[in-house]
From Swiss-Prot:
Gene3D superfamilies on file: Na+/H+ antiporter like domain
One GO CC annotation: plasma membrane
TM stretches of this protein: 18-38, 59-79, 97-117, 127-147, 167-187, 265-285, 297-317, 333-353, 363-383
Molecular function terms, GO-annotated: sodium:proton antiporter activity
Pfam family, any one: Na_H_antiport_1
Gene that this sequence comes from: nhaA
Record-given protein name: Na(+)/H(+) antiporter NhaA
Role of this protein: Na(+)/H(+) antiporter that extrudes sodium in exchange for external protons.
InterPro entries in the cross-refs: Na/H_antiporter_dom_sf, NhaA
Keywords: Antiport, Cell membrane, Ion transport, Membrane, Sodium, Sodium transport, Transmembrane, Transmembrane helix, Transport
Broad class of the protein's primary localization: membrane
An example Gene Ontology biological process: regulation of pH
Amino acid sequence: MITRVRSELTRYLRTETVGGAILLVAAAIALLWVNSPWGDSYLRMTETVLAIEPLHLELTLADWTKDGLLAVFFFVAGLELKRELVVGELADPKRAALPIIAAVGGVVTPALIAAVIGHGAPGMDKGWAIPVATDIAFALGVLALTGSRIPATARVFLLSLAVVDDLLAIILIAVLFTVGVSLLWLLAAAACMAGWWLAQRRRLRTPLVYVPLALVTWYALHEAGVHPTLAGVALGLLTRVRPDPDEEWAPAARLEHLIQPVSAGICVPLFALFAAGVPLNATVFGELFTDRLALAVMLGLLLGKTIGIFGISWVAIRFGLATRPSGLGYRDMFALSVLGAIGFTVSLLVAELALPDGDTVELAKAAVLITSLAASLAGSALLLRRGRVHQARQDALELQPDEGDASDPSEGGSLR
């Protein structure tokens, strides 16, 4: 009975709609809790220190979720990236061109907009990086919920885009927030990564090898002064993707199947619970539209991501640098670009890393939350509308199969 319940639960957690919904519920609980009469208890909880004395680790619960649990999320992201690079959409240079170009546009444009608008504001020396990332789980969850009538190539494009986007964000985290690196600990982390790679080559399958290697890699990077979530990405990229003839599943697919429900159902929601608790009042809402940092984050996400992803994609297609995904019109791609403005998880992480002042962090988080909500609502509305268009076209084809394909204007080269 317990096994069956656990099996059903993990099956549900693997669906993008459920994962996105749990993430949203966790963020809503945090917001309601911190803005309730019991808000002080929320703050006390997040600031509670949990120490592992022999290892000299003293982190608050909020830091454990940020540095520890998100490493699991980034491990899954690393597995997804490796799969896409080796056997997925990014393995074919022709198909990979568009999501890669779109991801670059979706990182550079928000950063430029944020840097210009927030120039001179406290924290903007690194705060320009806050709006550069797309939340994979949230964006795919919204697409699964509202874009069921959109061609399947939409999910492939958005997933590939978000994976490359997250890779670029991870590189920024490594470059911007690595200070005072300890070479000895960095070498220790590299040795553990080499051990993981060697175990993969030797076809070792026991968790008694991989779990200690993962934990020591995380600890070594933490002690080295490198953000420890990068351990997850590195180990994910070092995991074998192609199965042997005697294997039903490759190690990467097996690990993703096992760990993705834990990431979606526990790790990311707990991070959201501890990170999304932002006091919202009239003062905060007023500052959102007057403070340069808040405006930089909001416009960087909502305008920068949308313009960057869609604009650079349109240019690449028009000039023959990439091809448009089969079945998708420019209006479909615009709707997907709006979903790219859902920053959430990684944007909240970067806000905590980039901004030293508590009040500034809370304001930036509020900007991320408000903008991510706006992007999800706007993207949902656009996807629902596009879904009706695709459904109407399909119905027309079924009723009049001999009259040809009544094409949608957005499917051609026009933006109409």
